[in-house]
Amino acid sequence: EDPFSLVPSKDTDGHGTFLAGLAAGTAFPLQNFTGAAPMADLAIVKLKPAKKYLRDYYLIPEETVAFQENDIMMGIKYLRVTADRFRRPLVILLGLGTNYGSHTGTSPLSQVTQNYGGFFGIATVIAAGNETGLAHHYAGRFSADTSFEDVELRVGEEEGKRGFILELWSSAADLYTV
């Protein structure tokens, strides 16, 4: 049987297939592997790539996989509606990362996942990332008597060819000089 006759698209990078295996993979005792819930039913959302104007704005390279936050939220809504229709509990697994945003839980997507996680029978699982030690983030805190802090930003040669995006997050009264 051709598995691709059952679905309208293919997972070309393997990330979704890998996550599905972690979530509900069959037990392979000889390889010491079992998915978290091997008997689970899966409902999968295939996200479309981010629109060109957003990729251009954020200088996202053509070969980089990127999605839009609003599409992710619509996918979550679809899963919620599907779980309701079948009267099933739902675990929403998001294995999508970003280096953008404040990471404070205040983005629209963060709010949606937090809200759905408050419903009975729904759990949200969000990957913590796999870029430890790559120095994509800097956090600093200033005391009242600190007037400035120099922070060096190193941009790789390839990234610098097109430009780069830098986000600065602070309280409203703070000032930055760049």
Label for each model-derived stretch:
Residues 1-68, 87-88, 121, 161-162, ...:
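Subtilisin-like serine protease catalytic core
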Residues 51-142, 146-148, 160-175:
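Substrate-binding/access-modulating region of protease and related hydrolase catalytic domains
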Residues 4, 145-153:
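Short beta-strands within extracellular/lumenal beta-sheet-rich domains
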Residues 7-9, 30-33, 82, 112-113, ...:
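Generic recognition of flexible, low-complexity loop/linker segments
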